[in-house]
Amino acid sequence: MLEDFRLKVFMAVAETGSFTKASRKLGVSQPAVSQNISSLEKETGAILFQRARGEVSLTSEGLVFKEYASRIQYWYSATSEMFGQKGKFTS
């Protein structure tokens, strides 16, 4: 099952083009980023990033996944805003 943190890791790598930069941005170790991406690729059955000399770029499958990941993150955020501790539907 896709988890919010894994999507955050994916988006950070996609935005920074680097596992190391993504790890700094998220405040986690580089191996944690690498493991999350590997697990995500295994789970989806898709190679999401092309790796070369410390830099990564999205594959065509990765580009499509990014579109969906962006939408999922939006809905996570919107749901949290509406139903979270201080949300509009919280007493």
What does each model-identified segment do?
Residues 1-5:
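Short helix-coil-helix linker/hinge
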Residues 6-13, 65:
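Short alpha-helical "packing" element that flanks the helix-turn-helix/winged-helix DNA-binding module
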Residues 29, 36-39:
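Residues within the DNA-recognition helix of helix-turn-helix
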Residues 12-27:
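Short helix-boundary/capping micro-motifs
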Residues 41-58:
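A short LG(V/I)-centered, amphipathic sequence patch enriched
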Residues 18-19, 37, 51:
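Helix-turn-helix DNA-binding elements, focusing on the entry/boundary residues of the two helices
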